[in-house]
Amino acid sequence: MSITLTQLRTQVRNMVDLDETDLPDSIVDQFAREGFQRIYALERRWPILQESYTFNTVANQREYTISTIGDIREIISVVDTSTHGARLNLIDYNEAEGIWLGNLDVASRPYFYSFWDKKLQLWAKPDIVYPMTVRAFRNPVYTWLSNVDEAIDLDEWFHAILPYFIIARVYQRQEDSDLSAMHMRSFDEGVAFARRDLMKASSAQPVVMSGGKQYPTLQRWLQTLGRTL
């Protein structure tokens, strides 16, 4: 069940038996933000952050500011969805700039992408407009701190756990180290259980270790399917 900041404030005060005078909103909100950030510091790929975005390339334009595509934290894949499109391969920027250099930097269909300076680079730079779909993990949203009736941007697993972090900080503020440590352990244990459940591999798609699955190289693709395009 989702929880809002308003509900979180009430829940915490009820659990520690304090009123708004003794535990003002500003303190609860500060601790809530800290616990929220601690959870997101553990993983960059929480399932709740999964998103898909689309954009169109511009002829002869290599770089695209990531923030104009979406509020992206980490890109997983870039796919050219045109008729003869393909999934682009990630390439290191240093390697790419050494290949597409001088007279060799000719505009054509891009097959590679890289990141640098908060921008997405396409290699080669597009010769025409290509529709692209980006699968990515977005950044966490903090609007729940100002819109107190908006659900906190966490998986519901953590909505029941976050109060324990705030309570631990409240008792720490009151210099009650025993109760603070007890509630922090409850928070840490709850987060560990949630993390294990949310991040484990799907039973329908077991983890394949290195060497267990072969992927065609771009060269092989060009020798087979690519030559018929």
Can you say where each PLM-predicted feature lies in the sequence?
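Glycine-enriched, solvent-exposed interface loops adjoining structured elements
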Residues: M1-L229
